[in-house]
Amino acid sequence: MENHNFENQGTFNREMNSRHLQMLSIGGVIGTGLFLSSGYTIAQAGPFGAVAAYLFGAVMVYLVMFSLGELSVAMPVTGSFHTYATKFISPGTGFMVAWMYWLCWVVALASQFVGAAQLMQRWFPSVPIWVFATIFAVIVFGLNTLSVGWFAKAEDALSSIKVYAIAAFIVLGTLAIFGILPFEGTNAAPLFNNITSNGLLPNGLVGLISVMLSVNYAFSGVEMIGIATGETDNPQKAVPQAIKSTIGLLVIFFVLTIVVLASLLPMSEAGVTEAPFVLVLDKIGFPYAADIMNFIILTAILSASTSGLYASSRMLWSLANEGMISKELVKINKHGVPMRGMILSMIGVVIALIASIYAEDTIFLALVSIAGFAVVIAWLAIPLAQIGFRREFLKTHSVDELEYKTPFSPTLPWITVILLVISIIGIGWDPSQRAGLYFGVPFMIGCYIYHYIRFKKW
């Protein structure tokens, strides 16, 4: 088997570089999962439990990206892990993974738009949720109609804003932790006392495991590096660079951010109705700081949503390119954009959005749960595909021929699989997160059954 004979069959333009890949991935990751759901994680697992959960999630994502790096460098195709799962696990699994991942972003986009609308109500409390959600949907769709080169530049700019903003938040929060800046409700430096004020795990181990789905959702998007390799110039060089820099940046930012939030935000005040970042800045007392942060979070959500629509439309294109759905969706316009795939994805988003606008405090968590389950299933396919790829590759090649290698293979990929399975099992311990199982499992089984009926193979 040759590791260099996988080419895209469409007319995508290879206009992305390593920085574009990095910012596309960061753009997909840093959204409502960090800015809103982090409050839910603290409320459920406690401050210390939230820090532990995000550390565990960071390790798990890092392990997944080892496997994705090897596959993406060896086979730089649009569709990424869907294609790898089809070839190295089974066609039915590839079909299921692609639709689960598409579902992940359709649901995630709806929740991002709801999250953005919630934040806008800080300034316009009388305007209905659906109005702002619709406005954000139109903007995201418009950005995705740009050519990939201009799209990458726009995403780079949007992602840079939130990277600098999070860095500033970490600095301000750290100054408040050590008493250099005042913090409402404290007469002395709060330090890290709040992290253990409710005990290490106030809701027990069950509370910790139950939030892992939300944490997985917070990290979803990092795998976009693989999806975009088919539109990347010199992927053998750009992909490893992007993976290394992206993972390092995300781990540092996520962990430090959660430590700051856990140190300053009491468990009783955490939730998803108001962004925890805004709550903290309000308590620090910076004039207009919370409003500024509110705007920055909106920018972050816009960036994450733009990346999400990009990923979902490319996944539909990949399915069509392999003949698993109508070939009409494989068509790409003169700007190198799969417009029909984008429109179909937006239809799915609108359906999910309509279902969420009347009960955002409950439906929002259900949407996050479904998206979190779907992305873990997609992640699960990555190390399994790497194990299959390495086994096939070694039949005719040596490991030294691989330009990017997953260390300690197959042991490390199998450890990754076990950790992902544990996080899936944890869904059953939180009633508010079980929607992921109730909706995700039947959808997954349905994909397998449909594929077998249509193509007569699993």
Language model: regions and residue ranges:
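Membrane-interface "cap" regions at the ends of multi-pass membrane proteins
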Residues: 1-39, 43-48, 62-66, 78, ...
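Helix-loop-helix connectors at the membrane interface of multi-pass transporters/channels
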Residues: 1, 8, 82-87, 92, ...
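C-terminal membrane-solvent junction of multi-pass transporters and transport-like membrane proteins
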Residues: 157-158, 328-339, 379-431
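Hydrophobic alpha-helical segments of multi-pass membrane transport proteins
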Residues: 143, 166-172, 316, 369-399, ...
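Helix-loop-helix junctions that connect adjacent transmembrane segments
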Residues: 7-13, 51, 125-128, 160-295
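TM-loop-TM module centered on a large, flexible mid-protein loop between adjacent transmembrane helices
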Residues: 83, 90, 121-122, 195-198, ...
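Hydrophobic transmembrane alpha-helices that form the core helical bundles
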Residues: 52-53, 62-145, 150, 170, ...
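Membrane-interface loop-to-helix entry segments
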Residues: 117, 131-189, 219-220, 243-244, ...
